[in-house]
Amino acid sequence: MNHRALAAALLLLPSMLTASAGAEAELSTPETVVDAFHEALGGGDRQAVLDLLAEDVLIFESGGAELSRDEYAHHHLGSDMEFSAATESKVVDRRRGGDEETSWVLTRTETSGTFRDREISARGTETMILSRGESGWKIVHIHWSSR
């Protein structure tokens, strides 16, 4: 047995546990999950986006619907990440309601930037419904609208 490797692992264990606890604490409220979702979209972190969505998430946008996490991953996730990276959104208003198991987060935004050679200046509304399970809060529904 390599005692140096074991000693190094034992020395690193507290920091690994702290990092894990910190990540859990960072996603302890519906609002922090919504913020993490948008941060992952803008940062191009596909796996982080998908990890925050329930498998059976329903996503409504511009009259269209994606009926699962897998469908979203294979259809609009890429372009949503590209749009989020190219633009800047400012939260104008946010409200939350619900209880310990189900919560909703309503957000109004102003978005600006250039996307695919087109100037963007839009007001948006977003409704997210989250459900709390064994693995924490997951997004079960998103409805986006903008003008």
Predicted regions and their residues:
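Surface-exposed, charged secondary-structure patches
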Residues: 58, 74-120
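Second-shell loop/turn segments in exported
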Residues: 38-39, 58-63, 116
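A mature extracytoplasmic/lumenal domain signature
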Residues: 53, 63-64, 107-111, 126, ...
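N-terminal, post-signal-peptide region of Sec/Tat-exported proteins
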Residues: 46-82
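Bacterial N-terminal signal peptides that target proteins for export
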Residues: 1-8
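Short, low-complexity N-terminal intrinsically disordered segments enriched in polar/charged residues
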Residues: 11-55, 71
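Short beta-strand edge/turn micro-motifs at domain boundaries
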Residues: 123-147
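Beta-strand elements of well-folded, non-transmembrane domains
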Residues: 42, 111-115, 130
